[in-house]
A protein has these predicted regions:
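Extracellular/periplasmic bilobal clamshell ligand-binding domains
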Residues: 315-355
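A ligand-binding cleft/hinge motif common to bilobed small-molecule-binding domains
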Residues: 96-100, 229, 235-252
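Mature extracytoplasmic/periplasmic domains
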Residues: 272-330
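Periplasmic-binding protein-like
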Residues: 136, 204-210, 217-218, 249-273, ...
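Early extracytoplasmic/lumenal segment of secretory-pathway proteins
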Residues: 32-100
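A bilobed periplasmic-binding-protein/Venus flytrap-type ligand-binding module shared by bacterial periplasmic
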Residues: 141-146, 186-191, 265-278, 296-299
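Short beta-strand->loop
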Residues: 108-117, 129-131, 159, 235, ...
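Extracytoplasmic ligand-binding site segments that recognize negatively charged/polar headgroups
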Residues: 43-50, 87-88, 92-226
Length: 355
């Protein structure tokens, strides 16, 4: 009678040990499956990175990368609101807003890496507190279909926005909420004899030049596609990358590098200070600067690489070559002066331009 009870006891022990072993072998994997949250623009950028860039990093590190979508201003506000207990680990911001984030103490210094060393000099932020993940410039875009129907020549200058024949056909992003709008205004201001330290010429000339032609001031560029489709928009500030996205959707738009030049626009990344996973966050940030990550972003989302070692072929290589040509007449703006004066400019813009 002892044998069956011993047998049952041994069997029960074996089962218990097997269950324990299974749980032990599973627990490290479960513990390692962490989630990193990254703030960035929604739409094309989010789809590109989620669908084609993050996967290799997620697989190699057994983690999940989740996008918190929003404009640069939205992402900055979220980071600032949770400064002492960050909900995000990394964030992408337009360069001007990134300088504000750095000034607010929201970013950790980038850790040294080969990818960081390889970047274009213009893609490295002061003190390496952030780094550019892609580069571009704000110039002019136009509705090719409308121009063809009207027999208009393609625009060549920022001052074409003031041509009376475009009355009610110009769409302009708000200076107060859009880097494209800010760039467009500042380059117009320079043509009028101003500088970032003196925007009086631009504000003074606007109501009698570009102002009368503007159909609508839009908070972001999201509405541009719709206004091109409906035949409302003839011309607007935009980047070659954004134009490429619209063309991929079948919209009749083209980019023009104005003869006065364009404004350099870099999308930067920074690791958020005091985040819950600093080591993984820095590892992700370094990966996103690598030629491999940037090649995927270029191929699938026309994101122009900040790392010149990124390999490109076919149409992507042609795009990079064209962008390098545009960069020859692209100009940088003074973000320190801009950020110091932006609140006053925004208030004046809202009161005198968008009233």
């Amino acid at each position: 009678m002892n044998l069956p009870s011993r047998f049952l006891s041994l069997r029960a022990t074996a089962v218990a040990l097997a269950v324990a072993a299974a749980s032990l072998s599973a627990s490290p994997a479960m513990a390692q499956t962490k989630t990193l949250y990254i703030g960035m623009n929604g739409g094309t950028m989010e789809k590109t990175y989620t669908g084609h860039v993050f996967g290799a990093f997620e697989k190699a590190n057994n983690i999940k990368v989740v996008v918190v979508p929003g404009t640069s201003s939205d992402i900055l506000a979220k980071a600032q609101a949770n400064k002492d207990n960050p909900q995000m680990h990394v964030m992408f911001l337009d360069d001007g807003i990134m300088y504000r984030a750095i000034g607010m103490g929201l970013c950790e210094k980038m850790q040294p890496s080969q990818a960081l060393n390889d970047l274009f000099p213009t893609a490295r932020f002061k003190g390496d507190m952030a780094a550019g993940v892609n580069v571009g410039m704000t110039g002019l875009a136009y509705n090719k279909k409308m121009f063809a129907e009207k027999g208009w020549a393609a625009p060549t200058s920022w001052m074409d926005l003031a041509d009376p024949k475009f009355k009610g056909k110009v769409v302009f992003q708000s200076l107060a909420s859009s880097t494209f709008g800010l760039h467009g205004f500042l380059l117009f201001n320079r043509i009028q004899g101003g500088t970032e330290k003196n925007v009086e010429p631009g504000f003074k000339a606007w109501p009698t030049t570009i102002g009368p032609n503007v159909l609508e001031y839009i908070p972001s560029s999201a509405k541009v596609a719709e206004m091109v489709q409906t035949g409302e928009a003839a011309m607007f500030p935009l980047t070659p990358t954004a134009v490429g996205v619209l063309k991929d959707k079948g919209l009749p738009v083209e980019y023009v590098q104005p003869k006065e030049g364009s404004a350099v626009l870099t999308v930067g990344e920074c690791v958020i200070a005091k985040n819950s996973e600093p080591a993984l966050a820095h590892k992700l940030a370094q990966y996103l600067l690598s030629p491999e990550a940037q090649a995927a972003a270029l191929e699938h989302g026309d994101q122009i690489p900040s790392n010149p070692k990124t390999k490109a072929t076919g149409a992507a290589a042609a795009l990079v070559k064209q962008m390098n040509e545009y960069m020859k007449t692209a100009t940088t703006v003074d973000w320190d002066v801009i950020n110091e004066n932006r609140p006053a400019w925004n208030a004046r813009w809202n009161k005198t331009v968008e009233r």
